[in-house]
């Protein structure tokens, strides 16, 4: 398999996670405690960033940026089976690097534990909707 699509998946996933996490950090800092404003700012930044990344990397790798997307497309026969494992490894590595980049940009510890509880049926329903919806 050529290296270019693998690099596109790693870089695209890293930039996507840096955008999602970075805009979330910035929105929380600037929103003055207004969660609705913070979520709106994060959603707009994420949507714009995702559009740009798909436009840039779509022609190179298909712009999966998510292991579930890769597995779904592979299972449906829309992506070659030989691409699945390299793409997933690239996506996981890119995701970690993207979060680290966001933390670096905002002078936060590279590794830190979340102070927010992220559990329960609502969280799982949101994740399922975002992933499979």
Regions found by a protein language model. Give the residues of each.
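Membrane-interface helix-loop junctions and terminal tails of multi-pass membrane proteins
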Residues: 1-133
């Amino acid at each position: 398999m050529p290296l270019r699509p693998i690099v596109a998946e790693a870089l695209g996933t890293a930039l996507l996670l840096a955008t999602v996490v970075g805009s979330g950090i910035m929105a929380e800092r600037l929103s003055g405690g207004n969660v609705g404003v913070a979520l709106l700012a994060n959603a707009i930044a994420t949507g714009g960033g995702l559009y740009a990344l798909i436009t840039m990397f779509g022609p190179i790798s298909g712009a999966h940026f998510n292991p579930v997307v890769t597995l779904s497309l592979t299972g449906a026969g829309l992506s070659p089976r030989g691409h699945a494992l390299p793409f997933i490894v690239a996506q996981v590595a890119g995701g970690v690097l993207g979060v680290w980049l966001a933390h670096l940009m905002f002078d936060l510890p590279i590794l830190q534990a979340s102070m927010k509880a992220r559990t329960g049926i609502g969280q799982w329903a949101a994740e399922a909707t975002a992933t499979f919806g």
